[in-house]
Amino acid sequence: MSLKQSVSFSPLVELTTTKFSNKSKLPNLFFGKSKSRNSGKISFSHNGYPYFTAPRHPLESELPTKCGELPPMPTESDVGIGIDSFFEGKNIFITGGTGLLGKTLIEKLLRSTSLGKIFVLVKAGDKEAAVERLTKEIMNSDLFVCLREKHGSTYEEYVKSKLIPIVGNICEPNIGMDINSANKIMEEVDVIVESAASTTLNDRYDFLLDINVNAPLRLMRFAKKCKNLKLFVHISTAYVNGIREGIIYEKPLIMGENGRKHDDNDEISSSLFPLDLTDEMNLAMKACIASKEHDTTKELKRLGLERAAYYGWYNAYHMTKAMGEMVLNETRQDVPLLILRPSVVESCYKAPVPGWIQGNRMYDPVIISYGKGQLPAYLADPDLHTDIVPVDYVANTTIAAIAKHGIPRKAEVNVYHVATDFVNPLRFNEMFEYIYEHFRAYPLVESENIVKMRMFDQFSDLSKYLRDRVSERNAVLGEDAKVRKQNKARVAYAEQLCKMYEFIGFFKARFHTGNTRALLEEMSEEEREVYEVDATKIDWNKYFVDIHIHGLRKHVVNGTRLSV
């Protein structure tokens, strides 16, 4: 990518106009006090560089029970939240509508509510191109099969009456909209859903800053001009919480907070590692200019990794998403803010299409590589929990939370962890056992000797195991140079994959979901049936063996044949 093709830094001025002061020690609003945790400490090497000693992971006995510290299980409610009545005639403006969650959210709103219109921001050259993209990526999507069956011959007419494409770009000033479109939305919109983001973990730092920090800021500034706005909804990620361990509660991030802090008694504090968003923007801009004669993309990816590690996040994506939350909370003034933090989002569990998914996400490259026999080992603690949530559960929780908080009360911030570990835990050894069962029953045509996944806690041990297997394979296949080259590339890819997702294999935090459970308790019986948010009902064996991987193969791996 040339310098001219790189991210424009003109929008960075938007953030620098408000210099956020975070030099003083910030109050701890993120965690309750916990005297049972060893919180870690900062030490210094012989050359003066600080390094972080991770805190001890709490023992299982120290954690709440399966539903500990959560609201009681839901009881029947005749009144409910009032989801249908809230959305009746309401107009929604959504960014990221062609993404996995955005598309699922749109489908559910069209199928289950009687809302007014959905304005969908579409990156396109003109109105005609926007309509074409909306038709191709949303109306013709396999995800809309139930809606298509429901409306029959009037399906296209119905969707076109509800979905209004808006030409724009969240990475441009004023979101790239023309004045007429902007005025129409400002007059009519009730709820804004900000779902657009870059989900590439280690993308260019400048790009991640622009789309995950500046873009939400631009949208919030636009939101303040909307006359009837009732709620601003921001789709974030549970991993904005950084390298913290133990139980993580649904609290908003505060400006300048880093990913290291645990509680008020920690030696690690935001005063020692203050995160200044303006400084980070300027640093990325300078790096972009300085590296124009070199490999700009490589340099800016490296910079993102370095900054994330320094401030206590696993990667630049998580760090910039955290910064996005901070800037929204700091600049919203009297705009009510709802933040949804899903964990690892994967395919639909139930409706409208079990197994439907878009894109090769998180665990999916691991699953497919394993199914081909190219990834027999992984970096993870087999006894630790992983946290996965089907995308339909995220969409339903978002809709229910919007209805609950969209009725004007006061301009507050509400945070929801959309996660499963607290109420329906899944260990790594269980997940990989289910994946093994699937490929044993339905092997890929190109699969090679599927064995049970081996898990390592050291990268060096994993690398040696992979290379030893390749050496054995080369010995059997002979001296064919092409085969040796292919095997070498496979090992390199496997190592890269394991290293990229190493953080998830040893992640020792658990996302508290008290707000989601309280939401479930408030829902009526009918609402619970229509908007499934109860994660205790997920059967992980069924999900992996019969739903998710089948969907992955159909929708992502281009319909790979099953060799049963």
Q: Residues of each region from the PLM?
A:
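N-terminal Rossmann/SDR dinucleotide-binding element
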Residues: S2-T200, Y205-L209, P216-L217, K225-L231, ...
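NAD(P)-dependent short-chain dehydrogenase/reductase
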Residues: R244-H318, A322-P408, F422, M431-F439, ...
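Hydrophobic structural elements of the Rossmann-like NAD(P)H-binding subdomain
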Residues: V233, L340-R341, V418
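Residue-level signal for the nucleotide or nucleotide-sugar donor/cofactor binding architecture
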Residues: I211, V389, L426, F511
